[in-house]
Regions:
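Thiamine diphosphate
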Residues: 2-8, 16, 50, 59, ...
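Extended, charge-enriched "interface" segments that sit outside catalytic cores
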Residues: 11, 48-237, 253
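Conserved phosphate/anionic-ligand binding catalytic regions in large, soluble enzymes, centered on
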Residues: 94-111, 243-272, 357-372, 376, ...
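Active-site cores of enzymes that catalyze phosphoryl transfer or operate on phosphate-rich substrates
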Residues: 193-215, 281-344, 643, 753, ...
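Hard-cation-handling environments
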Residues: 485-486, 496, 500-613
Length: 935
């Protein structure tokens, strides 16, 4: 720093507290445009040595330096005569800053010592022109939270290394919030990155490592060669999770929901959640409970239990999950949001989500990014998630980071949401415990995600039958010689006189005896008397059972009027005002109900009865096709008003959320929500049904099969806009055939409602009936405003959902020569063309529920056509799509024996729809003519 500039700076009155903010603003201006500040100030700022980081990141440290000088300028007045000392002072502060930014790159993280990062020049004092001669000099430490104002440089460097280059590598300087950074600095710098634990706590950590290792060795001996996806090498996960639960309990948490993949899952089930070892052994032996459906492999199964902590009982729930990595994460978040909504405490610490990831999967699977992007979105936030990465440095056979990812760390994705990231060596259980408490406290304090990167290794192959040395020879040579985490820590405690060899041996023997006994090995386990009531009213119900379908006409009109009334202070957009005026007319009985009016009235009747409704999707508030307008936007000030939230004071909650632009994570979230909250009608709407296949993993692994595999009921509704209107291959088909292909054992319902009354009753049936199974709806687009797709108030008040609808025109059944069966929008094309042709010999029958197929209802509809032997199934979709291939066996069952069943529709096609309107129109006319023309 130039001597003249320093003297002028120290002599000036700008250091007074009143001008501190002025200096900070001046520096901000300099960072933005150096020419915008006075030449003297610019010269001084330019002489500040660089740190290799961005100017805005460096600014916070310089600003703190200014603040300290402003507090006690006299402390530095003597330095005027020695400007070199002042220059070194700034360099010392920059050295501190360098450790905060990049100390993690020199941390001792890899238990095997194989993973090495390049040396960081910034961490060398010489880089900052600090020499060994300066080591005995005292310098102000700025904001370094060690509890001292000044330290000798040598001592300061030692403290920085202990804090940032030990078994913990802290990454947090990417966070923009100064408050959050200061909080982390206070927590880790005040103890130099090393918390103090009592002898009892250390013994507990050893005991938990003993359990983690003991179970794996026991299973390996008892069931050699069986897949168990061992935790060995990452044993510290067990004490980490147990410490997390203990600390959460003391912090007021009452529920913990965990999601994890296969690695270490069996260990967590037994040693953390308290599953009986004997039950696990039975699963290895192939025994199963008959009532659990088709079942699943043991390392996919969930579990729940109650654990005693110092703060009270904590309910633990480990989510069921498939082998599709990372997809369980948004399911967990959805489950947690449901529990928070049930408590009506969205920012509460009472429910804690913990997601456990693999190092290869957390970087490789896009659903991780989608889930992180939801973490602060209003409809999906849960007050932060503790995200633990079991970083065993290998993904199946891929261990070269240049193959696995494009970032230095597997956790770098966490920086997109400014989550702090704490890397920790899994062979140091005390560092693991310290980081665990730190991470949870950060999450609880700031309501944000936090990552723990548990740096470990995988002692065996991907599974126990795999031979890893074929692809990782050097790594596995090292692993064979490397002692286990339990052995390393037992030796340390013996050396520190905390335990003896006999103590450690006794722990091993006692745990093995407990496994032999087969009973629970988690002493904190308590009888589970919480949460078990939730699903009992929804057991053992069938899809066709009756439900309270009627609503008194007077009440229905009152509700219709209430949800179509907006306060005068709300200035509505003109088209929206017209829609609401029409709904007022519908409520008065002056107009027939359209789709949007009937749908929103269904929600009103449910919340009126205290039943919550949650609706989410990319444009759910308005509706992709401008039909719903559940949320009204004030044109004068941008505020919003949701009429369905103002039915009456004691109503059920109505929440509608415009989702982030995601299918996979959002649908998984809503599945998790619905499986945790059966009382809420949970609905996910795709922007177009075509885009739902972005969530195909959720549909295949959870929605269609979750009950059969895991016994998990779910009442989720999927609204998938579907219909051929000439909009091309990406805006026509929700892929009805794929859902029908997944249907078996009455696992879900697939409906194609064709009238407003049908959607009204379908939604009410889903909420009011006891059965909780997914409902997949091919919802309309053009029918939303079709003049024939309307329903009367009487149909809403006194009707019910009809899985099949017969002929509506007055045709003489005896004169009918052909019956055309169909679903969805094509019905209206057929109806209008038949009326135009003045045909009396073709009846049109609608199948509104394609699965479970309504055999009885269809037989009732068709009984008047017993003389007919010419039947046609008409669909808009190509031959190889739609319902034809999946459902024709049902059609044949309900038509008279020996009758012909013919297809009318588009020819087989690789693409769902054509891209040219003229071709579309010709195809549409051809299929309608084909269905109606009787030779």
């Amino acid at each position: 720093m130039q001597n003249g500039a320093m003297k002028a700076w120290l002599d000036s009155s700008f250091l007074s507290g009143a001008n501190q903010s002025w200096i900070e603003q001046l520096y901000e201006d300099f960072l933005t445009d150096p020419d915008s500040v006075d030449a003297n100030w610019r010269s001084m700022f330019q002489q500040l040595p660089g740190t290799g980081v961005k100017p805005d990141q460096f600014h916070s440290k310089t600003r703190d330096y200014f603040r300290r000088l402003a507090k006690d300028a006299s402390r530095y007045s003597s330095a005027i005569s020695d400007p070199d000392t002042n220059a070194k002072q700034v360099k010392v502060l920059q050295l501190i800053n360098a450790y905060r930014f990049r100390g993690h790159q020199h941390a001792n993280l890899d238990p095997l010592g194989l993973w090495q990062q390049d040396r960081v020049a910034d961490l060398d004092p010489a880089y900052h022109d600090l020499t060994e001669a300066d080591f005995q000099e005292s310098f102000n430490v700025g904001s370094f939270a060690i509890g001292k104002d000044t330290m000798k440089l040598g001592d300061l460097i030692d403290a920085l290394k202990q804090t940032y280059c030990g078994s913990i590598g802290a990454e947090y300087m990417h966070i923009t919030s100064t408050e959050e950074k200061r909080w982390i600095q206070q927590r880790i710098e005040s103890v130099a990155g090393h918390a103090t634990f009592s002898a009892d706590e250390k013994k507990r950590f050893l005991n938990e490592l003993t359990a983690a290792e003991g179970l794996e060795r026991y299973l390996g001996a008892k069931f050699p060669g069986a897949k168990r996806f061992s935790l060995e090498g990452g044993d510290a996960l067990v004490p980490m999770l147990k410490e997390l639960i203990r600390h959460a309990g003391k912090s007021g948490t009452r529920e913990v929901v965990l999601g994890m993949a296969h690695r270490g899952r069996l260990n967590v089930l037994v040693n953390v959640l308290g599953k009986k070892p004997q039950d696990l052994f039975d699963e290895f032996a192939g025994k199963h409970k008959e009532h659990l459906g088709t079942g699943d492999v043991k390392y996919h199964m969930g579990f729940s239990s109650d654990i005693e902590t110092e703060g009270g009982l904590v309910h633990l729930a480990l989510a069921f999950n498939p082998s599709h990595l990372e997809i369980v994460s948004p399911v967990v978040i959805g489950s947690v949001r449901a529990r928070l909504d049930r408590l009506d405490e969205p920012s509460s610490n009472k429910v804690l989500p913990i997601t456990i990831h693999g190092d290869a999967a957390v970087t490789g699977q896009g659903v991780v990014q989608e889930t992180l992007n939801m973490s602060k979105a209003r409809g999906y936030e849960v007050g932060g998630t503790v995200r633990i990465v079991i970083n065993n440095q290998v993904g199946f056979t891929t261990s070269n980071p240049l193959d696995a990812r494009s970032t230095p760390y597997c956790t770098d994705i966490g920086k997109m949401v400014q989550a702090p990231i704490f890397h920790v060596n899994a062979d140091d259980p005390e560092a693991v415990a310290f980081v665990t408490r730190l991470a949870l406290d950060f999450r609880n304090t700031f309501k944000r995600d936090v990552f723990i990167d548990l740096f470990c290794y995988r002692r065996h192959g991907h599974n126990e039958a795999d031979e890893p040395s074929a692809t990782q020879p050097l790594m596995y040579q090292k692993i064979k010689k490397h002692p286990t985490p339990r052995k390393i820590y037992a030796d340390k405690l013996e050396s520190d006189k905390v335990t003896t060899l006999e103590d450690a041996t006794e722990m091993v023997n006692l745990y093995r005896d407990a496994l032999d006994a087969g009973e629970c090995v988690v002493k904190e386990l308590r009888p589970m008397n919480m949460h078990s009531f939730t699903w009992s009213p929804y057991l053992n119900h069938e899809w066709d059972e009756s439900y309270p379908n009627k609503v008194e006409m007077k009440r229905l009109q009152e509700l219709a009027k209430r949800i179509s009334t907006v306060p005068d202070a709300i200035e509505m957009q003109s088209r929206v005002a017209k829609i609401y005026a029409d709904r007022q007319s519908m409520a008065a009985g002056e107009k027939l109900f359209d789709w949007g009016g009937a749908e929103t009235l269904a929600y009103a009747t449910l919340v009126d009865e205290g039943i919550p409704v949650r609706l989410s999707g990319e444009d759910a508030g308005r509706g992709t096709f401008f039909h719903r307008h559940a949320v009204v936007h004030n044109q004068s000030n941008g505020s919003t008003y949701t009429p369905l939230q103002h039915v009456h004071n004691g109503q059920g909650q109505f929440k509608v959320w415009d989702s982030v632009l995601s299918e996979e994570a959002v649908l998984a979230f809503e599945y998790g929500y619905a499986t945790a909250e059966p009382r809420t009608l949970t609905i996910w709407e795709a922007q177009f049904g075509d885009f739902a296949n972005g969530a195909q993993v959720v549909i295949d692994q959870f929605i269609s099969s979750g009950e059969q595999k895991w016994g998990r009921m779910c009442g989720l509704v999927m609204l998938l806009p579907h219909g051929y209107e000439g909009q091309g291959p990406e805006h026509s088909s929700a892929r009805l055939e794929r859902y029908l292909q997944l249907c078996a054992e009455q696992n879900m319902q697939v409906c194609v409602p064709s009238t407003p009354a049908q959607v009204y009753h379908m939604l009410r049936r889903q909420a009011l009936r006891g059965m909780r199974r997914p409902l997949v709806v091919m919802s309309p687009k053009s029918l939303l405003r079709h003049p024939l797709a309307v329903s009367s108030l009487e149909e809403l008040a006194n009707g019910t959902f009809q899985p099949a609808i017969g002929e509506i025109d007055e045709l003489d059944p005896k004169g009918v020569k052909r019956v055309v069966m169909c679903s969805g929008k094509v019905y209206y094309d057929l109806l209008e063309q038949r009326r135009k042709n003045d045909q009396k010999d073709v009846a049109i029958v609608r199948i509104e529920q394609l699965y479970p197929f309504p055999h009885q209802a269809m037989q009732e509809v068709l009984k008047q056509y017993a003389h007919v032997h010419d039947f046609v199934w008409c669909q808009e979709e190509p031959l190889n799509q739609g319902a034809w291939y999946c459902s024709q066996h049902h059609f044949r069952e309900v038509i008279p024996f020996g009758s012909a069943l013919r297809y009318a529709g588009r020819p087989a096609s690789a693409s769902p729809a054509v891209g040219y309107m003229s071709v579309h129109q010709k195809q549409q006319q051809d299929l309608v003519n084909d269905a109606l023309n009787v030779d």
